[in-house]
Amino acid sequence: MGSMRKMSSSFKRGSIKSSTSGSQKGQKAWIEKTFCKRECIFVIPSTKDPNRCCCGQLTNQHIPPLPSVTPSSTAEDTKQGDAQSGKWSVSKHTQSYPTDSYGILEFQGGGYSNKAMYIRVSYDTKPDSLLHLMVKDWQLELPKLLISVHGGLQSFEMQPKLKQVFGKGLIKAAMTTGAWIFTGGVSTGKSVVSHVGDALKDHSSKSRGRLCAIGIAPWGMVENKEDLVGKDVTRVYQTMSNPLSKLSVLNNSHTHFILADNGTLGKYGAEVKLRRQLEKHISLQKINTRLGQGVPVVGLVVEGGPNVVSIVLEYLREDPPVPVVVCDGSGRASDILSFAHKYCDEGGVINESLRDQLLVTIQKTFNYSKSQSHQLFAIIMECMKKKELVTVFRMGSEGQQDVEMAILTALLKGTNVSAPDQLSLALAWNRVDIARSQIFVFGPHWPPLGSLAPPVDTKVAEKEKKPPTATTKGRGKGKGKKKGKVKEEVEEETDPRKIELLNWVNALEQAMLDALVLDRVDFVKLLIENGVNMQHFLTIPRLEELYNTRLGPPNTLHLLVRDVKKSNLPPDYHISLIDIGLVLEYLMGGAYRCNYTRKSFRTLYNNLFGPKRPKALKLLGMEDDEPPAKGKKKKKKKKEEEIDIDVDDPAVSRFQYPFHELMVWAVLMKRQKMAVFLWQRGEECMAKALVACKLYKAMAHESSESELVDDISQDLDNNSKDFGQLAVELLDQSYKHDEQVAMKLLTYELKNWSNSTCLKLAVAAKHRDFIAHTCSQMLLTDMWMGRLRMRKNPGLKVIMGILIPPTILFLEFRSYDDFSYQTSKENEDGKEKEEENVDANADAGSRKGDEENEHKKQRSIPIGTKICEFYNAPIVKFWFYTISYLGYLLLFNYVILVRMDGWPSPQEWIVISYIVSLALEKIREILMSEPGKLSQKIKVWLQEYWNITDLVAISMFMVGAILRLQNQPYMGYGRVIYCVDIILWYIRVLDIFGVNKYLGPYVMMIGKMMIDMLYFVVIMLVVLMSFGVARQAILHPEEKPSWKLARNIFYMPYWMIYGEVFADQIDRKTRIHIYAMEINPPCGENLYDEEGKRLPPCIPGAWLTPALMACYLLVANILLVNLLIAVFNNTFFEVKSISNQVWKFQRYQLIMTFHDRPVLPPPMIILSHIYIIVMRLSGRCRKKREGDQEERDRGLKLFLSDEELKKLHEFEEQCVQEHFREKEDEQQSSSDERIRVTSERVENMSMRLEEINERENFMKASLQTVDLRLSQLEELSGRMVGALENLAGIDRSDLIQARSRASSECEATYLLRQSSINSADGYSMYRYHFNGEELLFEEPALSTSPGTVFRKKTCSFRVKEEDVKSHLDQPSSLHHTPGPSPPATPGRSRLALDGPLSTELRPGLDPGISAGELDPRADFKSAEVAPSLNTANVASTQLTVESTVSHPLRESKLARYYPGDLNTYKTMKSRSFVYSEGRKLVRGLSNWGAEYSSIMDQTWNSAEWRCQVQRITRSRSTDIPYIVSEAASQDEFEDEHRESLLAPQISRSALTVSDRPEKENLLSVKPHQTLGFPCLRSRSLHGHPRSAKPSPSKLDRAGHASSTSNLAVMSDAPEGQNTQQEKGNPETEC
């Protein structure tokens, strides 16, 4: 199953195709028969292009219709009717043909090659045929979720962060749920398909598996579609699009394409109907065979146009409706829907003000008229009527962190399904976070967990009769009978609350079963946390259903059952729990007895599911299995009792430890994560870990022997190591907490695991690390020493006690309180005896000190107890048996070394008695072993290698003894057998070395090397045979058949391996050549040797023998021998690295062996056997039940009461929890985890900083808008103040006001006029509004920033005639020139201010304006603003001028002054430069260059203004006549009239101009000083920049005169000319 998923998910179409050509042809024929294409067959000329049909194709590209096939309506009607009317119809003017385009695409041009399946189909294709194609031919799995992405077809830009979040969320939602993604398929610039494709591309580059992204595109819109034509072909597709073409290319990140064809070219719409029908059909499919839910569909909207809004409405009107997720911030339709969703009330009602705002937004977004916007608004309101189905994803919102949560939450909230169905959906998606956050919340439909307790019995009865119906066929019969029993309880179920609770519990239990089957570990944990009682849940039918499931990871359980049953099983074989019990016994091996195979369980199982009782009634619980009763009568009675068991009894219908059964199921089904989770739950965790370790190890061994894939065996072995490590860690954790309790965990009886102990399970699993743990070794050491207390030289003391028994009294003994391993009964008996002895031997006087108390304890132990405990200690038994064995070997040596008489000697009789008694001991070991059957006992006994050695040695000795008692020659044969047999007895000594720390590992090395050498001997035999046969055949061609040939083949080649080559060996005494031994003996015809003997004739080919021998020795003596040495070396280091564990493991075997042996060694052991038989018979006669128990449970086992067992389990659970807590803390503190957490935090911080940056930019734009509006309000307030002043008749000359801002829509002349009004006291302040920041600076000279303000409007001034012509140039910057006035140029203007600079200040004047000396230490910053300023020519006065000039914001006014034929530039809102004479300003230009150097640019070069600034006195001057033209007066009057302000005329007769030369106060504006000054910039209320174009030509002509009273503007031009110029440039209204 898992491999099929991998094959379908990976995209290798060539390996998925059918293996036979017949099936390929059949599939190809089915595709061509089922799917069609559409072609236009009737030409209806288009009104726009007569050479092109209404379908979009050229008229010459049409194909004639098939003669045998006609359209749906007759051709004549079509031609005469629709053709004449000019209406083109798909159904009437197109014809279906078998599809000719399907196969595989290979995308090129994207930097890497991707493959995708594609097919061209008609727009009206049946969706079931398409789904069949996708599942069967394309090998796709049915989705668990369908995400349909809709959005803009044109290019649009997404914010980088939003695009990243959108892509990650979409991919995660699809990956975690196994979803399909539907898109438009074609990329048009940066459309929504491109954005989805980018996300898919990022995913495919980071992971191997590809998501299933299906593009449903119109065939007529596909670029290079001619390359796709072909039947079942592989085509190369170029993704580079033609910029001049209206068609679009397919997106190369998709895996499949369905190209809908309706006969049109270059038109969208063919795919809409097909896509919707396919989505509807997929939603009707079931997610899983276990889950009844259909495939949920969700719409995802990103950007989009008006058609997307219509699609959303269609989704919401579906039955059932389809929930929609809208991505806010992506633009256009998405933002409009998000806005409406946010501010719309339930039922689609929105506030009037918001309604108007939404309508305006629709008009601006889609360029709609009012009627169109109202129509679209109505559609949006229809969507908002089902607001609960629309989920809006807003990036950075608190409730939603990513897109995937929005999608999955929308599916749960949007669909009106019940809570169990929602749980099934979350389970199918494997999204436990969704279930935890959205489903398991308390509400009106969710019962609190505490309310589940009262109706326990009814729930159990209801749920127990429900599940068996789905498990086996025969179990439906019992259901009806069971209902008869439950009918009495119907009255209790009439309460709707109880029924609701019961349904909820049943839904939770069904979800638990599904979660276990689908291997959803997190869901199992969640369900347990939310009230699922596993004892109520787990039943035999459900457990068997779990064992028979085909879902989940692949496993080898059926193979194991087949091996155990030793027969071929049918494919639909139903595995029962009895089969599982046999499998467990087979895997565990040894004496393990599974509860499923015990008679009590089998009888109950047969009663419930066999022919005696109806099948599938209730749960079956497992109670502690009692010892099998002996005797036929007892068996019959027991069977009757089991038949009469009340199955309805809850105590019987429960598994005592349900987590045990589930963990074993998870292990056998190869579900490691589930097994580890179930291991943490429940009791006896250490035993469960060891059982899992053994099961996995046995399964790995079986899979390796079955020649399965190596990966399976390796995975199983790794799982075994994981559980073994868990067992060791748990033992270490418990040992740290309490040593004594940890030792109890090792030795207490496990009733659920074949009455074994943890130590036995660890030995069965060959878990060396567990046995080598300090806790286990302390326990073994206590057991090894018994009650003896010896620290140094224990072996010597024991030998002395054995050889000299009185020394036993001088040895130290321990009390029973010090024992860690004794059973509870033995401990109590020992304590009672000890207390009696203490009471009997108590001294009258009191003793003090610990030493005296210790002495007292030692003296209180009686001599008999000391002797008994001494000989019962395993260490004493070991040395006793060892001494006995060594004595036996000495006698055996004597027997075979001396002459053997006809009748055995006394020494030989002792040897024979030793062997016979040892054989009886081996028989006793077999009979008293744990397995029940004798065959099983023998099988377990033979699994030990030393037992096999003993069996062979004893058997050989018995045969030799029988032959030895016979006459000659049989007696000689018997003696020879004796001689050979003693070799095995000497080898048996190696077992004694196992107790030694240093010799024990070497014994294991020898065993492993022997196995390695067996493989080497096979290889050596091949080489030896090859040379031996060739040599023998060449040197002895005339040999007769004889057995000596076999000897001669191996004899010489074998000894050559050890270096003996037999080169020219000669017997010097006899001088006889041993020709058979020579390599190349002398030979020849008619030749004689030195002694005159005739030489044999030469053998043909004898010269080859030395060459063959050289090659043989090279291979055998050098290559193979060194190879064997290398293998031995590897084995040595392998065992040496674990020598400590090996020795400790062997030590356990030795200790347990001598712990169970009788005290006396052979041959005296016969007395112990007689004692055991007598005790057994006496115990049976007395009917002591304890006797069987004690005899059966001899060994290292602790029997605990129920209360003690409960405390032990609680201690173990605490250790497990603390262990995982420490492990989690360790993982969190690891470097990798810290790096991961740090990277996540840094990423989150960067995202937050980006958000803050975006918000800051938005706030800046908002503040600029607010600032602009405030300036407008300020200007309006100024106007109102002026109007009120005029109305109140207040003289403006008495008011001194300074306004720092003016409206951006005011004229420059009006601002000058206003400034003069504010300065009517005689001290002029010129206020100009510049477009830039508010920059106030103080200069030694009169310098100012560039006069970009004058680009706004041309202002004409009356100029004093000094030159022939006066010309008004384009101002660029202000420059103070104290020198003589330059020659006048045409159009040049000068601005004069009357009054000498040295005039003293009068009381009541502006206190901020005063004359003062220049400060040479002042900060000179004019280099940045006016770099041409010459400080040497600056006058010794400080004059500051505040200049304010405003610009209009509307494009109409900008276009009026700056036509479109010049360069454009950005405009900024108005700012001010302030200059005043004698004033020391607090604000300057310190940050001018830093803030504006990067954004200011020179718009155009301008000429220079030269303006004369003079002080004005109260009296009129006669030197400078005041000239006012009539046109200027008229214009001034019109300006004031336009602003509805009746400004009184200022008396010009009071103004006088001083006689001071003009050259001392000139303000010059030069072109080169505009560098670095900000351009005119303006922003709309929405923050969008607007462009304006300057017009230098309009600045050249004269404007209107200023109406200020303190400005004398003189011009050289005639008054009439000035008037004409002034009339040609009317001012705009402020």
Curated annotation (Swiss-Prot):
The regulatory note on its activity is: Inhibited by extracellular zinc ions. Inhibited by intracellular Mg(2+). Activated by the neuroactive steroid pregnenolone sulfate. Negatively regulated by activation of GRM6 receptors in the ON-bipolar cells.
Q: Which biological process terms from the Gene Ontology are attached to this UniProt entry?
A: calcium ion import across plasma membrane; cellular response to light stimulus; G protein-coupled glutamate receptor signaling pathway; metal ion transport; monoatomic cation transmembrane transport; protein localization; protein tetramerization; retinal rod cell development
Give the Cytoplasmic membrane side ranges.
Answer: 1-877, 966-975, 1030-1107, 1180-1630
Instruction: State the compartments where it is located.
Output: Cell membrane; Endoplasmic reticulum membrane; Cell projection, Axon
Record key words, sorted = Cell membrane, Cell projection, Coiled coil, Endoplasmic reticulum, Glycoprotein, Ion channel, Ion transport, Ligand-gated ion channel, Membrane, Receptor, Transmembrane, Transmembrane helix, Transport
What is an example of a GO molecular function annotated in this UniProt entry? calcium channel activity
What membrane topology does the UniProt entry give? Multi-pass membrane protein
Q: Which residues lie on this side of the membrane: Extracellular?
A: 899-944, 997-1008, 1129-1158
Coiled coil segments of this chain: 1235-1255
Q: Locate the region Disordered.
A: 1-25, 65-92, 453-492, 620-643, 824-858, 1362-1414, 1575-1630
Does Disulfide bond count among this protein's keywords?
Answer: no
Q: Which InterPro entries match?
A: Ion_trans_dom, TRPM, TRPM_SLOG, TRPM_tetra, TRPM_tetra_sf
Basic residues composition bias: which ranges?
A: 474-485
Mind telling me which residue stretches traverse the membrane in this protein?
878-898, 945-965, 976-996, 1009-1029, 1108-1128, 1159-1179
For bias kind Basic and acidic residues, which ranges apply?
Answer: 825-834, 845-855
Primary localization class, coarse: membrane
Residue positions with a glycan: N1129
A single GO CC term for this protein reads: dendrite
- Polar residues composition-biased segments: 69-92
Say what the protein does.
Constitutively open nonselective divalent cation-conducting channels which mediate the influx of Ca(2+), Mg(2+), Mn(2+), Ba(2+), and Ni(2+) into the cytoplasm, leading to membrane depolarization. Impermeable to zinc ions. In addition, forms heteromultimeric ion channels with TRPM3 which are permeable for calcium and zinc ions. Plays an essential role for the depolarizing photoresponse of retinal ON bipolar cells.
Assembly mode: Interacts with TRPM3; the interaction results in the formation of a heteromultimeric cation channel complex that are functionally different from the homomeric channels. Interacts with GPR179. Associates with both guanine nucleotide-binding proteins G(o) and beta-gamma G protein dimer; implicated in directly regulating TRPM1 channel open-state.
* Name under which the protein is recorded: Transient receptor potential cation channel subfamily M member 1
Q: What is the lineage of its organism?
A: Eukaryota, Metazoa, Chordata, Craniata, Vertebrata
